[in-house]
Amino acid sequence: MIKHLLVLSTGQHVGKTTLSLGLVKTLQSKFQGSGKQLAYCKPVGQQHVAVGGGLRVDKDAFLFKEHFGLVQEYKDMSPVLFPDGFTRDFIDGKVTSQQLMDSIRVAHRNLYAQSDFLICEGTGHTGVGSICELNNAQVAAELKLDAVCVALGGLGSSFDQLAMNREMLKQNGVRLRGVILNKVNPKKMDMIKDYYSRALKRWDIPLVGCIPDLKDLSCPTMADYAKLLKSKLISGKSASLRYFSSTRLALAPVDGNNLFKAIPNQLVITHSGRKDVIDAIIGNEEASSTHGRNLKSGLILTGWNPPSTELAQRLDADNIPCIYVSPDKADSYTITARISQFTAKIRRDDVERIDLAADHVSKHCDFSFLDE
């Protein structure tokens, strides 16, 4: 069995973290009762959180350590961060690529010695970090890591992107062990699996996973929207991890000729002064609850007049999460546009979806290549 592996992807939001979740869960199950240890590392991180003692680490390292109970130290799991302004500092000579690589090398050495298998997760596509002479392929070559690459489900454009990423790996002498397709159209699974596998044969690289798209994994939560819009929940805080199957910008009046249809799992965006819309949402939620159902609605309000305490209490009583965004931050149209373009990462506190992602990956991937 190989002892360490780098998880790459052809781009951002393709599925590195999702795949890593499934891989960690698979290996933890395999190691259970054996005394073997599993380790995780994000050699180069970008989004980061404070973990105490003045230390900040990559969000993914935080998620993996806390969710899976990994025992290694944070400083090794996230040795290098690229915060805002870091690239300029590098070009100004405040830090060198040798210093950065030394930090990664020490962290890898520690984790490798402390574990029976080490999963390293890359950042973005294979070339990310090149401006600091620290891209994923260079890191893999330095640490003598083989790689597995995640690509988006599809054929032509997906394979084109894979080819570019593979070329960078080849230039650095990194072996690509396998390819995993993510977010594949369920209706095209068999066709894509067949043709992609045949296309990969020219490189003698196996397709080791074909993961169908699961919308529940990519839908942002109310907590994600609150962070995106730099606002806070004014109600329904216990439903902060609620996510939605549709979004509605409510502009038309609600009256006898224009009823506000009750749609489950819908996020509504409207003006804070639209009492007719807000009352209709609350009324629909209460009517559904009398029949033992929960519409699981969500609400984003904008406008110069913040929602009253009374309204927040009414929304809270029906557990409807609501965010108020003042117009100096964004109007209804801007909010709708931001939401439609937003892709959220799985949150550490969203245990249900972490487990869902791990199980989904494990079900559709064959990790037996690790035993070679």
Write out the residue ranges for each language-model feature.
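Flexible phosphate-sensing "switch/lid" loops adjacent to ATP/NTP-binding sites
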Residues: 1-372
